[in-house]
Amino acid sequence: MEETRRRFVISSVLSVSLIYLCLSTCHVSAFDFGRRQLRFNTDGRFKILQVSDMHYGFGKETQCSDVSPAEFPYCSDLNTTSFLQRTIASEKPDLIVFSGDNVYGLCETSDVAKSMDMAFAPAIESGIPWVAILGNHDQESDMTRETMMKYIMKLPNSLSQVNPPDAWLYQIDGFGNYNLQIEGPFGSPLFFKSILNLYLLDGGSYTKLDGFGYKYDWVKTSQQNWYEHTSKWLEMEHKRWPFPQNSTAPGLVYLHIPMPEFALFNKSTEMTGVRQESTCSPPINSGFFTKLVERGEVKGVFSGHDHVNDFCAELHGINLCYAGGAGYHGYGQVGWARRVRVVEAQLEKTMYGRWGAVDTIKTWKRLDDKNHSLIDTQLLWTKNTTLEPNFGFSCSTIPQH
C-alpha cells in the first residue's frame, strides 16, 4: 500500500512537471529551442563572472596602458587573455558576462571580428555559457552594433541575443537587449521556474540628439517598456501553478554605461570598493532607475565604463556596482591591478530538504595580481532582510573616456 502511494506521488509530480513544461514553451520563441538552459547547480549555487572594458585590440601586438615601466615592454592584450583564463579556472563560473567595451574599434583594429574572437576566446575555450553587451567603443569600426551582436550571437557557447523576439512590439532601441532566466536545479520543485532573472541592456554609445554635443547615450523609453513587460510576465509565471511562489524572483541588470544614480556616491559614503574617478553617465536621466525601484524586483545593477571605480553601494534597495577594468589596453592606474567582479546566488532549503528560492546574493572581486587576490566579499541581498540605504553625491570633473 505504501509503495503504491509512493509511486502515485512520483507519477503525479512528473505529470505536473510535464504539463508545466508544455505550458511554458508557449512563451518560448523558436530562437530559444536548442540553446542551453541556465539553471542552478545541485549545490544550490549559481555564479556569474562579469568582465568589463577589455578594450581588446590586436593581441600580442597591442601595447598596454597604465602599467609600470618594468611591465610595459612585455605587456599586451595577451595579459588580458591570461587574466581571464586564470580567473575562469579559479572561479569556475556558471555564466560569463562581458559588459561592454570588449574591443576597441576606434582606429585600433582593422579586423574587428578577429579582435572579438581573441577577446572572447577564454570563454569559448572554457565551454562555459557566456553573453555580451556592447559599450561605447565596441562599434567604432566598420561594423555596426547590430552586425556585432549578430556575430557575437553565433559564436560557440554564446547565449547572447541581438534583441528579444518581441522587440518589434516595442520598437526597441539598440541592439543587445535580452533576458536570461536561471531555473531551479535538478530535483528541485522549481526545476521549471525561473528563480533568478538577468536583464542585459544596450545603453548605447553617444547621443545623436541636437543640443547635447558629444555625450553618452541612455536607456530609452522603449527599452524600459520592454523591461517592465518582461518583468511582469516573469512575476506572473513565478506565482502561477504549479508550485506557485509568494514573492517575486530577484533580478540583476547588466549595462555598460552607468546610470546617473551611480554619481550619488562619493568617498565619504558607505560603499564597498573605491571611487577613483567621476561617474561618466548620460546627461539625461531617463528614469530607468525609478522604473527598477517601482518594480521592486532588481537587486543589483552592474556596469563598467569607469575603469578605476570598483565600488558597490546601495540606493533604495538596489545595489549599484562597478566591475572595474579588466583589460590591459584600456586605461587604468599604475599599481592598481586589473579586476573582474563575481556574483553568486545561493538557494534556500525548503522544509522538505529540497532547494527552494534564492536566499542570498553576494559579490566579490578577483584581481590580476601575484596572488590572484579575492577582495571585498559583500552581501548584496538576502531574502529575509532589507539592507539600510546609502546616499551620497559627487560632482567632480568628468575625465575623458
Swiss-Prot record:
Q: List cellular component terms (GO).
A: extracellular region; plasmodesma
The residue range of the signal peptide is: 1-30
Keyword field contains Transmembrane helix: no
Q: List residues traversing the bilayer.
A: none
One Pfam family assigned to this protein is Metallophos
Identify the cofactor(s). Fe cation; Zn(2+)
Sorted alphabetically, which keywords does the UniProt record give?
Answer: Glycoprotein, Iron, Metal-binding, Secreted, Signal, Zinc
What does the note under cofactor report?
Answer: Binds 1 Fe cation per subunit. Binds 1 zinc ion per subunit.
UniProt-annotated glycosylation sites, renumbered to this chain? 79, 246, 266, 371, 384
**Where in or outside the cell is it found?**
Secreted
Specify which residues bind Fe cation according to the UniProt entry for this protein.
Answer: 307
Family under the similarity heading: Belongs to the metallophosphoesterase superfamily. Purple acid phosphatase family.
State the protein's name. Answer: Probable inactive purple acid phosphatase 14
Task: Please give the organism.
Answer: Arabidopsis thaliana
Gene that produces this protein: PAP14
